[in-house]
Every structure is written in C-alpha cells, then in structure tokens.
C-alpha cells in the first residue's frame, strides 16, 4: 500500500567535529584542515590506506586533451566504488565524496586532497556495510542516502550529522535526494514514491498518489513496450533544477517522466529496439532537452521544449559517435558545445562542437577501475567517479 505521509521522530546525532576522538592525524598530510584532533576515529583499514597513499602521488598520470585541458587522477585513501560528489560553497572548495564500504571523504581545497571521515557512534565493521549513493547540498544544509536504507542530514556544512529514521512502510528504497534549503528536501524511492519534508525529516508528504507499479497496472494497455515486464523498480532517477524527473525501468525497456503537480508518473516508450542504458537533462535544463544512451554505444538527444504533460513519446535525434560497441554509462553537457561521455572499458570521449566530432582522451582506459559517473560542478571543474577508489579531476 502506498502511504501518503510518515512521521519520523528524534533525529539521532551521528558524528560531530566538536568531540575529541582517538587519533590526531594532522601530521599525516599537507591538507588544509587545521585541527584534525577534533575529528572522529578512523578504522584500521582506512587508517592504513591513509598512511600509504601520499607515497604514491608521483605515480599518478595526467591525461591531456587536444585543447590543453586535462584529467588528473586524484589520490584517495580508499579502494571502494565512488557514487557521488557534492560541494557546499559557490567556489566549490569544501565538498564531500561518498561511496561503498562506508566511504565518506571530505575536501577543503576543491577536490585536490580528501580526508576520510567516520561516524563516531557506529561500529567500524557496521559502517563498512553501508553504501552511500547520493549526496545533495543547498548552502550549508546537506542530505545523504544509502543502503541499507539510511538518511543523514546536516545543517552546518557537515560539521555535525544527524540520522533520520526511515519508515519501514516506505515504498521501495531511497535512491535520490535533493536538498532544498530551510530544512526542506525531496526524496525519491526505487518504487517511484516522491516525498517532501519541510522540517528536517521529521515529517514527509507524498507528492504522487501511487507507485509506478500501480500506475502501470492501470495503463498496461497504453502501448508502452516492455511495461508488462516491469519488475517494480526504476534505475537512474534524475531530477533537474525545475523539479522534473526522469526514470528508467530496471530492464531498460521504457522510461518515465514526472513533474510537480502530476498525480502519477507517465510511462513512455523508447523509439529504438536497443534498451535504454542511461538518461539525463541537458545542462540540467528542461528547455535544453534530454539525452539518452542505449546499449551498444547509442547516443541521442531530444527536441527542445517537449511537453511533460503529454503522454506521447519524445522525439530523439541520433548523435554519431563510434564507441566500438562500448555502452555509454554517463554524459555531461557542460555548455551548448562541450560534451563529455564515459563508456565501458574506462573510455572517455569529448566533443567541442555539439557532438559532430569526438576525441578520445588517451590513457584513462589504462587505469585500474571502471568509470560510472561524470559530474561537472561548474563549467570549469568536473569529476569522474569509478571503482577501486578511482577519481579523476578536470580543471
């Protein structure tokens, strides 16, 4: 049953910089954190990695693009899968990086160096079971979600975090959260439930009347190919700056859209025989269009000014790019001309003319690790996240 709202009481403190912990790590690096002794304990594995990684800095290569831009491998004290990165200030100096095995890293120099952070009231072995997948900030207010189901909230840029209890009646698992400021956030689950809180997670109000599964049961005769194979979950949920959403069915058979004010998600048929692999808003703007990647390396973009209220499928135009059959996992449309894509096999391509011509970035595919996510925090600074603690920085 889909619930319209739920109440969460007693936010639990997770960790705070105002406590004194077991280890002073100030002497271990040259980063700009001035008072490491006020931070929290570091488990054995993270501590050993943190001791070793400065000695390897000189071994990390730089990959140069024809336009004198470059991607540089950032040394990290972890070997986990990295899922998301976010900064708390307009200058993009102070930020957080999250991933599997309880990975929670902090930077104060724009992403050049990262320091591991550990929750003070969680056992180190327990923390390693968490997989932090998404982080979002609006000013100094931030939110983190992960699996097993967990929601964290901060109102001071990450100095102190609180754990928000997750209702056992929540349809699906949290998969995306967007900080809105003033103790507000929007939470989406793998079942298509969307909730908004205006009091730091104590209460949540549903924005849709039913889950995607229920919607498809009503519209199964609508002609949406693949809807009958829906497993009940969606992947790759994307929200743009206007609060509009895209979501892909777990099999990639079709996609769905939602915008504020609608009672349910609208399923839409794909226009190709290949399954959808990934989607996103171009420059995070609904008016710019949508991009879609399909299995085997297909890439297309929609026409502009499409109607989210219409039940018709959107029109897409193919972009000619030869990836050698490698699937396109993510894309970043930095501006009207500059496009970056990451593919299977650790391959990165760049176009500076709206996708007419593409250049492969040499050397990145030689690194140990797969690439999963590319994110530009502004027009001049971007990051690529991958497995084995692989983080690439562009500036």
Curated annotation (Swiss-Prot):
It comes from the Eukaryota. It holds the Pfam family PSII_BNR. Keywords: Chloroplast, Photosynthesis, Photosystem II, Plastid, Thylakoid, Transit peptide. Residues 1-28, 29-66 form a transit peptide. GO terms for cellular component: chloroplast thylakoid lumen; photosystem II. One of its GO terms (biological process) is photosynthesis. It is found in: Plastid, Chloroplast thylakoid lumen. A 7-bladed beta-propeller torus, about 54 by 55 Angstroms, with a depth of about 25 Angstroms and a central pore. Essential for photosystem II (PSII) biogenesis; required for assembly of an early intermediate in PSII assembly that includes D2 (psbD) and cytochrome b559. Belongs to the Ycf48 family. PANTHER family: PHOTOSYSTEM II STABILITY/ASSEMBLY FACTOR HCF136, CHLOROPLASTIC (PTHR47199), PHOTOSYSTEM II STABILITY_ASSEMBLY FACTOR HCF136, CHLOROPLASTIC (PTHR47199:SF2). NCBIfam families: PRK13684.1. This is Photosystem II stability/assembly factor HCF136, chloroplastic.
